Swiss-Prot record:
The name this protein goes by in its record: GTPase Der
Residues noted as binding GTP 1 in the record, renumbered to the chain: 10-17, 57-61, 119-122
Family to which the UniProt record says this protein belongs: Belongs to the TRAFAC class TrmE-Era-EngA-EngB-Septin-like GTPase superfamily. EngA (Der) GTPase family.
PANTHER family: GTPASE DER
Role: GTPase that plays an essential role in the late steps of ribosome biogenesis.
Residue ranges annotated for the EngA-type G domain, each copy included: 4-167, 175-351
CDD domains from the UniProt entry: EngA1, EngA2
Gene name linked to the record: der
Subunit structure: Associates with the 50S ribosomal subunit.
MF-aspect GO terms: GTP binding; ribosome binding
Gene3D superfamilies, sorted: 3.30.300.20, P-loop containing nucleotide triphosphate hydrolases
SUPFAM superfamilies linked: P-loop containing nucleoside triphosphate hydrolases (SSF52540)
Residue sites binding GTP 2 per the record: 181-188, 229-233, 294-297
Length: 436
């Protein structure tokens, strides 16, 4: 299901990150009382009144070297392009500022619902000061103390009230995939090359996210695919499309909608921190993964080149041991014909179910090879295991004491399950649970 997007905007030091964390329900942003602190995590999932939504802290997208007004203009433009609902955060302690008026004039022109949250209203006496914010022309101001959690419920009520109508579940028979990677790694060329293959029939269809265009095609075997647009075929204001932090946000949204993620690396430039960050997000989200090294035609090669590259990739992406690596060229179409079948195999792995009896035979064989650990004279006992879900395949292992299940033994069991059932290209999750 595609989640609607809520963007938080506002000038530095008004408490955007604190409100973000309060709504997301966990401390996932770096919060310091210093103006302009950048944050690593700018994207999370929020839930209120049984409605889920994607939450974006646009303050984390700022170019900190840019002039102040350019930063907040950037935030507002991103919010207007990307969001279904905008939460504009101001400070009740400082009152209306020139920067607040500047942002409000930009937001006033949008058709996107704007919720005005007056933060740092930390005591009842301060509520009388919020009326000045009516001058911004954005409707009723909501008094909030995000540090203490006061008033956030009212803001969440307003968010849910303004979310678009829930969309119907998407067809599970269609495999959805996206190509993600840093700007200029050749994603567009790869997309064009994939769609240019004679074996596929491509047609642009209206996407389910705001202003997006996805591409639907069918292969020679009749399998339907949807390629999710991460390039952002959006309205004309694409000033910041090639900035790296902006592309992080786009990539995260695409990952949310994908069954399989193709992590594209530019062979000419190698692996960067951006690649590891985005790949980590896809891994945490439980998505199928393929590592695609593009522009392979530009590399001088000998008999050891592929092995060296594979070793380096495995070293840099140690959490992606399950992900296949493929070396391609969008220009020469080298190995591109292998991608649709590889995507299909990984989708099958994502949806694979293992009968409990067969699974437990593998678990018992694993214990015979490597007995369960002990701690302070007490041995871990595994009673049985069962698969509880797919996408990604998730297994619960019932034990006598959860604390005795060390992560290294869980990893051993995961490796044994992989060896038995070949979960190609997908993470699998093992959860230890005490038997009642």
């Amino acid at each position: 299901m595609v989640l609607p997007t809520v963007a938080i905007v506002g000038r530095p030091n008004v408490g955007k990150s604190t409100l973000f964390n309060r709504i997301a329900g966990e401390r996932i942003s770096i919060v310091e009382d210093v103006e302009g602190v950048t944050r690593d995590r700018i994207y999370a999932t929020g839930e209120w009144l049984n409605r889920q939504f994607s939450l974006i802290d646009t303050g984390g997208i700022d170019d900190v070297d840019a002039p102040f007004m350019e930063q907040i203009k950037h935030q507002a433009q991103i919010a207007m392009e990307e969001a279904d609902v905008i939460v504009f955060v101001v400070s009740g302690k400082e009152g209306v500022t020139d920067a607040d008026e500047y942002v409000s004039k930009i937001l006033y022109r949008t058709n996107t619902p704007v919720i005005l949250a007056v933060n740092k209203v930390d005591n009842p006496e301060m509520r009388n000061d919020i009326y000045d914010f009516y001058s911004l022309g954005l409707g009723d101001p909501y008094p909030v103390s995000s540090v203490h959690g006061i008033g956030t419920g009212d803001v969440l009520d307003a968010i849910v009230e303004n979310l678009p109508v829930e969309e119907a579940e998407e067809n599970d028979d269609i495999i959805r995939f996206s190509l993600i990677g840093r700007p200029n790694v050749g994603k567009s060329s790869l997309i064009n090359a994939i769609l240019g293959e004679d074996r596929v029939i491509a047609s642009p269809v209206a996407g389910t996210t705001r202003d997006a265009i996805d591409t639907h095609f069918t292969d020679a075997d009749g399998q339907e695919f949807t390629m999710i647009d991460t390039a952002g075929m959006r309205k004309s204001g694409k000033i910041y499309e090639n900035t790296e932090k902006y592309s992080v946000m786009r990539a995260m949204r695409a990952i949310d909608r994908s069954d399989v993620v193709l992590m594209v690396i530019n062979a000419e430039e190698g692996i960067r921190e951006y690649d590891k960050r985005i790949a980590g997000f896809a891994h945490e989200a439980g998505k199928g993964m393929i590592i695609v090294v593009n522009k392979w035609d530009t590399i001088d090669k000998d008999n050891h080149t592929v092995a060296k590259w594979e070793a380096d990739i495995r070293d840099q992406f140690q959490f992606l041991t399950y992900a296949p690596i493929i070396f391609v060229s969008a220009l020469t179409k080298q190995r591109l014909n292998k991608l649709p079948d590889l995507i299909k195999r990984i989708s099958e792995s994502q949806n694979k179910r293992i009968p409990s009896a067969v699974l437990n035979d593998v678990i018992m064989d694993a214990i015979a090879i490597n007995p369960t650990p002990t701690d302070k004279g007490k041995r871990l006992k595994i009673f049985y295991a069962t698969q509880v879900s797919v996408k990604p395949p998730t297994f619960v292992v019932f034990v006598n004491e959860e604390e005795l299940m060390h992560f290294s033994y869980l990893r051993f069991l995961e490796n044994q399950i992989r060896a038995a059932f070949t979960f190609e290209g997908t993470p699998i999750h093992l959860i230890a649970r005490k038997r009642k």
